[in-house]
């Protein structure tokens, strides 16, 4: 009897596992052949699910962004909730920014603004912040958080508040 494969689940699993490989090696250091080897699948199997490296990166972004959730702190103030979210983002911030800048290298501002992976990432982070502070304050709060994380990373404190 043939093996029944849930293609959507398998595709999501491949993307999630490939995301860590992108983080470790950077966008420029990844090839479809290397990812296929890392995942233990043939290159043709990988291409069956993802026709290009950019399509794979987009799928990885979508899967990783599903895990962006607001830490639950019932009764906590908005400030405490934003601090908890910032702290939750801190451990992977440096590697995520390095990967992101590698991915964006050579793209124009217009290309970046139209890039689906960037839109997915920004929307997920914006939604998480808006859940805490509301839509009106979300963009400014997110910008403050990203600045805080960046300065914290440069200071070697992982953006902790």
Residue ranges with predicted function:
Residues 15, 58, 83, 122-130, ...:
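An amphipathic alpha-helix signature
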Residues 98-105, 134-161:
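Hydrophobic alpha-helical segments that form the core
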Residues 2, 10-13, 17-55, 59:
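Helix-turn-helix
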Residues 1-3, 82:
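Short, Lys/Arg-enriched N-terminal segment that forms or immediately precedes the first helix
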Residues 59, 69-95, 141:
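Hydrophobic alpha-helical connector segments
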Residues 90-119:
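Amphipathic alpha-helical segments used for helix-helix packing
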């Amino acid at each position: 009897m043939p093996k029944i494969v849930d293609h959507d689940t398998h595709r999501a699993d491949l993307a999630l596992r490939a995301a860590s490989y992108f983080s470790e090696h950077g966008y420029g250091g990844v090839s479809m052949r290397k990812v296929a080897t890392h995942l233990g699948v043939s290159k043709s199997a990988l291409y069956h699910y993802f026709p290009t490296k950019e399509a794979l990166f987009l799928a990885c972004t979508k899967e990783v962004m599903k895990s962006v959730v607001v830490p639950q702190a019932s009764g906590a103030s908005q400030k405490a909730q934003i601090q908890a979210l910032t702290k939750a983002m801190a451990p992977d911030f440096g590697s995520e920014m390095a990967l992101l800048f590698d991915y964006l290298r050579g793209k124009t501002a217009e290309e970046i603004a139209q890039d689906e992976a960037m839109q997915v990432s920004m929307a997920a982070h914006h939604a998480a912040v808006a859940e805490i502070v509301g839509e009106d304050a979300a963009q400014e709060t997110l910008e403050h958080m990203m600045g805080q994380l960046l300065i914290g990373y440069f200071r070697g404190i992982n953006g902790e508040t």
